[in-house]
Regions:
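Mixed-charge, low-complexity intrinsically disordered regions
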Residues: 1-97, 109-223
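Conserved positions in beta-strands of structured domains
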Residues: 102-108
């Protein structure tokens, strides 16, 4: 079987740094699914408006390294503990496929390159190829009592974000709300803890620079 992209994702993230580690963590983060001409057909989306969430099957396109090891070091475990690759969601896997659950915001059938699917809560980089889209079905896909392995014991913390008003003026209200949620997730590598280091990430075509001390993240510059 050969597969090809059916669409590409548009998001505020031009690089991998800063992207939420999982979908849904920054639930207001907006993105758009743009179909390639071959699949730009409104009939293929008929009935989609009756669902709230979608599954996206996509490629870790920024990861060009061939996966050869059966184990990886999840950042959530500090980057030292080895876990089987198929017991993680690491991008370093044989077929480089990712799976994300996103909320449907709206479907634009009238756009010039439509139909476009506007979604919230994705964890994809701008330009990510999408190979399949499926509806999220609650009765089959939701398992609220399921165990989550090492993830259960390493709950992600949330930082207090200090974003000076004079630095926030270049963003729309929607962008600013989403950016604050992304920053609260602590975009740094899990093992970094230098309170004097200034980190930078690109968001919505702006360079966002910040530092973290304890549970406090302060935005210090917008470029």
């Amino acid at each position: 079987m050969e597969i090809e992209p059916i669409a590409f994702f548009r998001s505020p993230f031009a690089t991998k740094f800063g992207i939420p580690k999982q979908s849904g963590l920054a639930d207001t983060l907006h993105g758009t699914i743009e179909f390639v001409p071959k699949y730009r057909n409104a009939d293929a989306l008929r009935g989609m408006e009756d669902f709230d969430y979608l599954w996206l099957v996509w490629e870790f396109s920024a990861n060009k390294h061939e996966a050869t090891s059966p184990v990886v070091r999840p950042p959530r475990l500090g980057g030292n503990t080895k876990v089987g690759v198929f017991a993680t969601r690491s991008p370093f896997r044989p077929n480089r496929l990712g799976l994300s659950s996103v909320r449907i915001d709206r479907i634009d059938y009238d756009a010039a390159d439509g139909p476009l699917i506007h979604v919230l809560g994705a964890d994809l980089m701008n330009g990510t190829p999408i190979y399949d889209i499926k509806p999220y079905v609650t009765y089959a896909d939701s398992h609220p009592d399921a165990r989550s392995g090492f993830v259960d014991a390493t709950a992600a913390r949330r930082l207090h974000v200090v974003f000076p008003d004079n630095l926030a003026s270049g963003f729309t209200a929607e962008e600013l709300a989403s950016l604050k949620k992304v920053l609260a997730l602590d975009p740094r590598p899990q093992y970094h803890d230098n309170p004097t280091k200034v980190y930078g990430m690109e968001f919505a075509n702006r360079d966002v620079r910040f530092r973290v001390e304890g549970d406090r993240l302060e935005v210090v510059e917008i470029g």
